[in-house]
Amino acid sequence: MLYPTEFDVIVVGGGHAGTEAALASARMGAKTLLLTHNIETLGQMSCNPSIGGIGKGHLVKEVDALGGAMAAATDEGGIQFRILNSSKGPAVRATRAQADRVLYKQAIRRRLENQPNLWLFQQAVDDLMVEGDRVVGAVTQVGVRFRARAVVLTAGTFLDGKIHVGLNHYTGGRAGDPAAVSLSSRLKELNLPQGRLKTGTPPRIDGRTIDFSKLDEQPGDLDPIPVFSFLGRAEQHPQQLPCWVTHTNERTHDIIRSGLDRSPMYTGVIEGVGPRYCPSIEDKIHRFASKDSHQIFLEPEGLTTNEFYPNGISTSLPFDVQLALVHSMRGLEQAHILRPGYAIEYDYFDPRALKSSLETKAIGGLFFAGQINGTTGYEEAAAQGLLAGINAGRYAQEKDAWCPRRDQAYLGVLVDDLVTRGVSEPYRMFTSRAEYRLSLREDNADMRLTEVGRELGVVDDVRWDAFNRKRDAVSRETERLRTTWVTPKTLPADEATALLGKPIDHEYSLAELLRRPGVSYDGVCGLRGGECGPSEPLAEDELLLAQIKEQIEIGIKYQGYIERQAGEIERNGANENTRLPDGIDYTEVRGLSFEVSQKLNQFRPETIGQASRISGMTPAAISLLMVHLKKRGLGRRKGADSVPGADVQADNTAAQQ
């Protein structure tokens, strides 16, 4: 039957990508339908019970700055919070949290059920409705047809998923859930380029059978306790729990080696490529054969369960080998395994067949997000889902697509890497992937993205008001520090010596003092000489005050580096954002080699910047492209005339940093 209501956007899948996509399009005012095979698994953490980390935490902050749910749900469900790289520079500091699976899932579902313009429906999708070269809806397994202007597909590992434990295997999207076999077959009929990837998960352990007296305790940060969302509060956190650390040993490695003849990875049963940066324990002992041991983190799954997640022993070895390797480690000699580890193979589609909006180039209105694009990780999925949801909503509203640039967000880096370079293995975000990481910090994600999010319609009044208070306070106080001066007469020698190590010998602004190594904002404002402290409190809320102080310190201490990077961004920006016409035939560009023109015609980059990052492209080829565009009056800047926030982001680069 044809469902009587027509929707603007249909989102298929209720994982981290699907939930963010549905919430984003609904926040924009698009009538949105979220189709999931099981409402009870909305927002489920299928693998590790944690959010964030290096690069990943940056993505979560950006999702939050654009009104997404992941950071706020983590604050409500997080049972341990840490700042990684806290002793290093601000560019690589990152938030990571352990989450109670049940509390996190409840927080996501609560937001879905209370979001205006969003409807939920429990049914697996078996087919897409395609008319000509555009999608017009989806068909469920019982034949219900839903029509929509745009469809976002967030299928995770479910597309023709196959689960492996030793040499045994069976179809499944994850343990306990069916695979999407019919939908996978339908997508293959559409002739979209695809392949197979693989990921895995470790066995789960009953905490009552762990000897914690033999393990090293790893507590979270307590002073202060971090929060993930810019609107978060430490008071939202439930009870905090420690993690625990054990290690593999030579006996563990011998047990693993003895089972490789029954490993699906080492016997050719698994064809898909696994994640390089989250390898199975089989891969670890093979790739790092010289290492005598590997750290294993025992992470609690929640407050109301005894289940522990042993981070570091993802495996698809036979269960008897899994049991032996677990028992070989200190503290786990008597451990009971609750669930076996397994590997899962699944279909993905070459992201080079996508536009930067995450819409497929071949089928109008069809968007892909998450593991279907070859990525791995909750955070990468959530970021893509949010972008796909925004652009599906804009597509339904007949507005131009939006995507941040590489110098504006890690989300921009992620998408640009996917659509220009593709993937040969599951893609994971790192800070090292960003050229301008000093400008793309966790602390300034809101300064970079919240204003454009407001224009896109995904930032609500509460977030907007909080952002404006913070931005105004940072601007006002930074200006005060730059224009307030102290002299040897107004700053007593003993105070100067306590702060700087010696008295001052001439006039300094407070900003110049703050720029000195080891000098903090509080230290400068605590000086009695002159008018050093602010005339009024920067914020009544302690968390907001801490965020303001951090922004001020980083902005002043790293001002020279940030300005240098801003200049580099400006110099590279002209060519980077020059659009390439949709219908251009690259074989007609004089001087291009056959190989280069063939690649350009195959991958159809949207901008000169994207073209420059395609494998095999040379500076000479880019110059020929620029000459071709100039001669024919083609190409235009990607930005102000087509999407919200382009003017704002260009004009306020310094303020964002």
Curated annotation (Swiss-Prot):
| Cofactor(s) this protein cannot do without | FAD
Q: Which UniProt keywords apply?
A: Cytoplasm, FAD, Flavoprotein, NAD, tRNA processing
Q: Where does FAD bind?
A: 13-18
Is the keyword tRNA processing in the record? yes
Which residues does the annotation say bind NAD(+)? 274-288
Q: What is its main location?
A: cytoplasm
Q: Where is this region: Disordered?
A: 636-657
Any one GO molecular function term: flavin adenine dinucleotide binding
Cell compartment(s), UniProt: Cytoplasm
GO biological process, any: tRNA wobble uridine modification
**What SMART domains does the database record attribute to this sequence?**
GIDA_assoc_3
Listed PROSITE patterns:
GIDA_1, GIDA_2
Give a GO cellular-component term: cytosol
Protein task = NAD-binding protein involved in the addition of a carboxymethylaminomethyl (cmnm) group at the wobble position (U34) of certain tRNAs, forming tRNA-cmnm(5)s(2)U34.
Q: What is the annotated quaternary arrangement, including any partners?
A: Homodimer. Heterotetramer of two MnmE and two MnmG subunits.
Could you tell me which HAMAP family the record lists for this protein?
MnmG_GidA
Q: Which family does it belong to?
A: Belongs to the MnmG family.
- Its protein name is tRNA uridine 5-carboxymethylaminomethyl modification enzyme MnmG
Q: Name the source organism.
A: Burkholderia pseudomallei (strain 1710b)
What gene name is listed for this protein? mnmG
